[in-house]
């Protein structure tokens, strides 16, 4: 059964990239919105987690109707993301440039032009892939990111090929102890690294205050900035009607005091603050169908992941 599911998943993604980009966009947009509505009505595990996360965003005691409407809007936004993923290979550079509302890109370009690297930390908002294709189109050139190893492997390889076609260099998010070193090399060479950071996927993340609760986020972007001298710049994304919106925020400086871990923790907390403001302004475009808040995490799995992360950090020179 597992092998059959893997083949079906691979076939589905293959059809997505091979067929959907050839159909009229209005048809496909309607179909994906309809699919998003169906997923929302079914109230599966992912939608339940989405609503648990959004409940923190919109207040301590949101009405059931308010939360349900927001989660429906969020699932439609998420469906739009997937529609655009399958159609991005045929979207022209001109449409990307004309269809993106960019804020703060001049500061990013200025830092890169000075020869200094930039590590951009992003939440799961809007459309990461469209934003990446846009920044490549503005003249930045190729940048480096990581991708979770999806199963089956064939689907992961399709995603890597897709993102490479947009101008990304893609490293696996797991299975390679040299990943941090490669990212550091790119930054020391004056390159751009873009990392999704609003969910801890390693068990070794940083605990932050987020919407009034404890949450765990990736400390890698801040650690890379501290180690390499690169600029740490949070980025928030959302949809503005038919447009993509990309806000590249001001650099978060490395604190003067404290040891390395304290600096990384303080900078990650500042990133979380930027994410919080961006998500609060555009909650329907935060596509977080996973556990983020510590209260929602399984204690035993969290403890095991933390132990594994500590072992990895020791093997990797103490890097988070």
Regions inferred by a protein language model and the residue ranges of each:
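Membrane-anchoring hydrophobic helices of lipid-metabolizing enzymes
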Residues: 1-122, 156, 165-167, 315-316
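Generic structural marker for isolated residues within well-ordered, non-membrane alpha-helices
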Residues: 16, 51, 132, 159, ...
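Non-catalytic C-terminal accessory region of glycerolipid acyltransferases
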Residues: 2-4, 8, 39-42, 60, ...
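Short, composition-biased local secondary-structure segments
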Residues: 20-23, 127-133, 153, 183-198
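Short amphipathic alpha-helical segments and helix-helix/interface helices
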Residues: 105-109, 132, 136, 159-160, ...
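A conditional alpha-helix N-cap/helix-loop micro-motif detector
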Residues: 98-101, 125, 152, 173-177, ...
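Catalytic core of membrane glycerolipid acyltransferases/transacylases, capturing the structured
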Residues: 114-175, 189, 203-206, 210
């Amino acid at each position: 059964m597992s092998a059959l599911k893997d083949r079906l998943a691979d076939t589905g993604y293959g059809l997505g990239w091979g067929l959907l980009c050839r159909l009229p966009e209005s048809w496909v947009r309607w179909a994906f919105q309809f699919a998003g509505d169906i997923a929302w009505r079914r109230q599966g595990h992912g939608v339940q987690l989405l609503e648990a996360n959004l409940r923190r965003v919109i207040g301590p005691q949101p009405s059931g109707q308010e939360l349900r409407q927001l989660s429906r809007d969020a699932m439609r936004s998420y469906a739009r993301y997937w529609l655009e993923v399958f159609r991005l290979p045929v979207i022209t550079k001109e449409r990307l440039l004309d269809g993106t509302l960019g804020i703060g890109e001049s500061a990013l370009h200025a830092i890169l032009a000075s020869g200094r690297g930039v590590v951009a930390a992003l939440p799961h908002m809007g459309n990461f892939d469209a934003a990446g294709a846009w920044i490549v189109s503005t003249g930045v050139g190729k940048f480096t990111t990581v991708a979770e190893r999806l199963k089956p492997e064939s689907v992961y390889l399709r995603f890597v090929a897709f993102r490479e076609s947009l101008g990304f260099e893609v490293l696996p998010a797991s299975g390679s102890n040299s990943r941090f070193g490669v990212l550091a090399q790119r930054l020391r060479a004056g390159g751009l690294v873009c990392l999704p950071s609003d969910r801890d996927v390693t068990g070794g993340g940083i605990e932050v205050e987020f919407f009034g609760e404890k949450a765990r986020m990736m400390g890698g972007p801040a650690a890379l900035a501290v180690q390499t001298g690169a600029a740490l710049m949070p980025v928030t994304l959302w949809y503005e009607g038919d447009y993509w919106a990309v806000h590249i925020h001001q650099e978060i400086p490395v604190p003067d005091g404290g040891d390395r871990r304290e600096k990384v923790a303080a900078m990650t907390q500042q990133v979380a603050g930027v994410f919080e403001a961006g998500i609060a302004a555009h909650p329907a475009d935060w596509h977080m169908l996973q556990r983020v808040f510590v209260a929602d995490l399984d204690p035993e799995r969290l403890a095991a992941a933390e132990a594994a992360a500590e072992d990895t950090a020791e093997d990797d020179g103490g890097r988070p």
